[in-house]
A protein has these predicted regions:
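ATP-dependent helicase/translocase motor core
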Residues: 1-154
């Protein structure tokens, strides 16, 4: 019998997958990664349960083959404000054989904490990064544009 919390987490992941796909991300499992999958243009890949040296990130986001972000997924009802330290830890973790959109030791730029109901986002390139509620996941093209522009002016 599957414990109720596992069912909640599985349902949450299914809904997050659907929201990521609606935003243009290709969802992949860590055992079958193709960081350049999809049509020509910007390749936005979300890899489930990606290993880091501090544990598996629920999702690691890649733009054109380089890691650019983390999504920490929690079941409905979780306090996302208390999860930001976990996503921040994954964002600075060492990634074997993976290129990054940040220097080693610097955090990946884009971090999300999400349930099936709400999504928090922060840009670690901001001088004083803070999580804020957003209505949906950003599109890969948006992140690519931001990465090409460099750090925000705030």
């Amino acid at each position: 019998m599957v414990p109720p919390t596992d069912k909640l987490e599985a349902a949450t992941r299914e809904e997050i997958d659907a929201k990521l796909e609606a935003a243009g991300w290709i969802i992949q499992d860590k055992n079958a990664i193709n960081l350049f999958a999809g049509a020509a243009g910007i390749h936005g890949i979300a890899v489930r349960e990606m290993d880091t040296d501090t544990g598996p990130a629920d999702y690691m986001l890649f733009i054109d083959g380089k890691a650019c972000g983390i999504i920490e997924a929690k079941r409905e009802g979780a306090n996302l404000g208390q999860v930001s330290e976990q996503s921040a830890r994954y964002a600075v973790s060492n990634l074997k054989f993976i290129q990054r959109w940040a220097e080693q030791g610097q955090p990946l730029p884009f971090l999300f904490e999400a349930t099936n109901i709400e999504i928090f986002f922060r840009d670690e390139r901001d001088p004083a990064p803070r999580s804020r509620r957003v209505f949906h996941f950003h599109r890969p093209e948006t992140f690519k544009s931001w990465l090409d522009e460099g750090p925000p002016l705030r």
